[in-house]
From Swiss-Prot:
Protein name as it appears in the record: Large ribosomal subunit protein uL29
Top-level taxonomy: Bacteria, Bacillati, Cyanobacteriota, Cyanophyceae, Oscillatoriophycideae
Coiled-coil boundaries: none
HAMAP family on file: Ribosomal_uL29
Family in the record: Belongs to the universal ribosomal protein uL29 family.
CDD domains cross-referenced by the UniProt entry: Ribosomal_L29_HIP
Keywords of this entry: Ribonucleoprotein, Ribosomal protein
One annotated GO molecular function: structural constituent of ribosome
Presence of the UniProt keyword Acetylation in the record: no
Cellular compartments per GO CC: cytosolic large ribosomal subunit
Species whose genome carries this gene: Trichodesmium erythraeum (strain IMS101)
GO biological process, one term: translation
NCBIfam families per the UniProt record, alphabetical: L29
Length: 82
């Protein structure tokens, strides 16, 4: 099973990203429970889910920084015109 591509994550809306983050965190929690009880069969899912979570959090942070940069640019432009 190949890792998910980051291009797929970039196509998601902010709300979808937030939902996916919650979903992946829940899956990681469930995997840890299975590991603790000794019933886990697909140990590679830890790596895949951590990778997916990192992608989602990276895109979320990029968008947050872009919004902040845009807002600060707008504020500085307004201050310069006065």
């Amino acid at each position: 099973m190949p890792f998910p591509k980051i291009a797929e994550v970039r196509e998601l809306s902010d709300e979808e990203i937030a939902n996916e983050i919650a979903k992946v965190k829940r899956e990681l929690f469930d995997l840890r429970i299975l590991k603790a009880t000794g019933r886990i069969e697909k140990t590679h899912l830890f790596k895949h889910n951590r990778h997916r979570l990192a992608q989602l959090l990276t895109i979320e942070k990029e968008r947050e920084l872009a919004k902040n940069a845009e807002a600060s640019t707008t504020v500085s432009t307004v201050e310069n015109t006065q």
